[in-house]
From Swiss-Prot:
Positions of L-glutamyl-tRNA(Glu) binding: 68-71, 127, 132, 138
Family statement: In the N-terminal section; belongs to the glutamyl-tRNA reductase family. In the C-terminal section; belongs to the precorrin-2 dehydrogenase / sirohydrochlorin ferrochelatase family.
Function of the molecule: Multifunctional enzyme that catalyzes the NADPH-dependent reduction of glutamyl-tRNA(Glu) to glutamate 1-semialdehyde (GSA), the NAD-dependent ring dehydrogenation of precorrin-2 to sirohydrochlorin and finally, the ferrochelation of sirohydrochlorin to yield siroheme.
Gene: hemA
Quaternary structure (record): Homodimer.
One Pfam family linked to the record: Shikimate_DH
EC number: 1.2.1.70, 1.3.1.76, 4.99.1.4
Protein name: Probable multifunctional siroheme biosynthesis protein HemA
Pathway: Cofactor biosynthesis; adenosylcobalamin biosynthesis; sirohydrochlorin from precorrin-2: step 1/1; Porphyrin-containing compound metabolism; siroheme biosynthesis; siroheme from sirohydrochlorin: step 1/1; Porphyrin-containing compound metabolism; siroheme biosynthesis; sirohydrochlorin from precorrin-2: step 1/1; Porphyrin-containing compound metabolism; protoporphyrin-IX biosynthesis; 5-aminolevulinate from L-glutamyl-tRNA(Glu): step 1/2
Record GO biological process: cobalamin biosynthetic process; protoporphyrinogen IX biosynthetic process from glutamate; siroheme biosynthetic process
Entry annotated with the keyword Isomerase: no
Keywords of the record: Cobalamin biosynthesis, Lyase, Multifunctional enzyme, NAD, NADP, Oxidoreductase, Porphyrin biosynthesis
Sequence segments annotated as region (Precorrin-2 dehydrogenase /sirohydrochlorin ferrochelatase): 367-507
Length: 515
């Protein structure tokens, strides 16, 4: 792209703002053992501190730090950052003095390589558990923290949004073979090949997501589970069905009664120490540490008859079983990389225009198009509160509603009594979608909603899927009207429903005030 023909220093300045480089540093289970990885494992508070420090560096426009039990990855965008070493930054900010040896464990990627790698990470292709579910949430949370700290710029915001969308599309459309969906499931699956857990007494330390998943899997295998609970100041305590509970502080009392101990907390300190085990006459046979930083002091493996497992001992390469699926996921990745390149091209071209409105670097994903629904057949699958709200809105636009659900809310029943809607009692079947103009899936069952999506996609029917915005061909709007004006509100990505609802309410109040 040549600048000379434009004779504008301001355009060059705008281009410097818009065309930013991306650089990343990655440390994961492939390059570093767990004792190294835990040195670069950070609390949420520490992540925020690191992001603020990096954002303040010269040339840095944005920074996102992804930190999981199996990887630490730093993504930086900015101008003239090609010579920046993000691995060195992490070493310095982590207080590590042995920079030279540690930096060799990091993979440094620039621009297209960094973009492709992040896409693969989000889709689970780089995970220790291939195609794992949790990584999507972890990538999403990393971007959210950067957003809260104001360290994410539009380049990384767009990249992470597209990565998350690609990952959810891959998860929805590609079915894989015999792959555990989490570290917890993988650990229990691998251990059950060597040990029989039936009637074994198992202590699970940590009532987070991983701990609860372990409990669920072990109960299926016939184990007797005791799980620890902390005294939380906020939030609901979820106790897995079939588990006994004890306070976290009483875990030592249960150790001599346990055959197996599994620990999966976010504690910065050991939950099980050498001293705790040394004084026991009867020691648990198996210890499983699913935390990073590690929960269980590694020296307990020195005791006779004690086996200690950590995350690195559960790696299994499932990619051989799923080569076709991996290829399909990479096709999805390439599609979203093209979307990102399209967005970058838009920014570059917008920098040359004199029209101020085009200097906005947001490329909207959906166009808000109002269509005539008068007499058009619309299928609504579901009979709950969400379906009720959808039907009430659609009726105001003259749609011919066909409803399929095993049960109806009282409001929907009243609409049926008044012959405002057509109704078939029962569960959704593919034939229900025949000759429909639009389809709304609003059940509380993911499998049903996904089936509606697949059927609608096959027949080329526009669909709104209440529990999965990635499966929506259109987002169902919040409607407002006053003084002859009818409008619909959605967020750019189809999420943030509470904000959309709040804004719509404010607009309605303004309309009422002007009446």
């Amino acid at each position: 792209m040549q600048l000379g023909r434009h004779n504008s220093g301001s355009i060059k300045k705008r281009l410097e703002m818009y065309i930013l480089s991306i650089i990343s540093a990655s440390l994961d289970y492939k390059s570093a053992a767990i004792d190294i990885r835990e040195r670069f494992s950070y609390t949420s508070t520490r992540i925020r501190e690191i992001l603020r420090r990096i954002k303040a560096a010269d040339g840095v426009s944005g920074a996102v730090l992804l930190c999981t039990c199996n990887r630490t990855e730093l993504y930086i965008s900015g101008d003239n950052i090609e010579n920046m070493n993000p691995a060195l930054l992490l070493c310095q900010l982590s207080g590590e003095e042995d920079h030279k040896s540690l930096m060799t464990l990091f993979s440094i990627r620039h621009d297209s390589e960094a973009i492709f790698h992040l896409m693969e990470v989000a889709c689970g292709l780089q995970s220790m558990v291939l195609f794992e579910d949790r990584v999507i949430t972890q990538v999403k949370n990393a971007a959210a923290i950067s957003r809260e700290e104001k360290t994410i710029d539009s380049t990384l915001e767009t990249l992470f949004r597209l990565c998350i969308t690609a990952a959810k599309k891959a998860k929805t459309e590609i079915k894989v073979k015999a792959v555990p969906t989490s570290a917890a499931e993988r650990a229990i699956t691998e251990l059950s090949k060597k040990y029989c857990f039936t009637d074994k007494r198992i202590l699970v330390i940590g009532n987070g997501e991983i701990g609860r998943l372990c409990c669920k899997k072990l109960i299926e295998l016939g184990a007797e589970i005791t799980i620890t609970l902390r005294k939380y100041k906020h939030g609901e305590i979820i106790i897995p069905v079939g588990c006994n509970t004890i306070p976290y502080d009483e875990r030592e009392e249960v150790l001599p009664l346990s055959d197996v101990v599994i620990s999966a907390t976010t504690s910065p300190h050991f939950t099980i120490t050498y001293d705790m085990i040394e004084k026991l006459e009867r020691k648990p046979e198996i210890f499983v540490d699913l935390a990073l930083p590690r929960d269980i002091e590694s020296s307990i493996s020195n005791f006779t008859g004690v086996e200690l497992y950590n995350l690195d001992r559960f790696y299994t390469d499932y990619s051989v079983l799923n080569q076709k699926e991996v290829s399909k996921i990479r096709e999805i990745i390439n599609h979203f990389i093209l979307q990102f390149e399209k967005w970058k091209d838009y920014r570059e071209e917008a920098a040359f225009t004199k029209i101020p409105d085009l200097h906005n670097d947001t490329l909207y994903g959906r166009f808000p198009l109002f269509i005539d629904l008068s007499g058009k057949k619309v299928l609504v699958v579901g009979g709950g509160e969400i379906a009720t709200r959808r039907v009430k809105t659609l009726l105001r636009f003259g749609a011919d509603i066909y409803l399929v659900a095993p049960h109806l809310t009282s409001e929907l029943q009243e609409m049926l009594n008044c012959k405002l809607i057509n109704y078939r009692e029962g569960y959704y079947e593919s034939q229900d979608i025949q000759n429909m103009f639009l389809v709304i899936a609003a059940t509380n069952d993911r499998e049903t909603n996904h089936k509606v999506y697949l059927d609608a996609k096959e027949k080329g029917i526009q669909m709104s899927i209440a529990d999965c915005r990635e499966e929506c061909s259109f987002y169902f709007p919040a409607i407002f009207e006053f003084d002859g004006i009818v409008g619909g509100l959605v967020s750019q990505n189809g999420d943030n429903h509470s904000l959309v609802k709040s804004v719509a309410e404010q607009i309605r109040k303004i309309g009422q005030a002007t009446d």
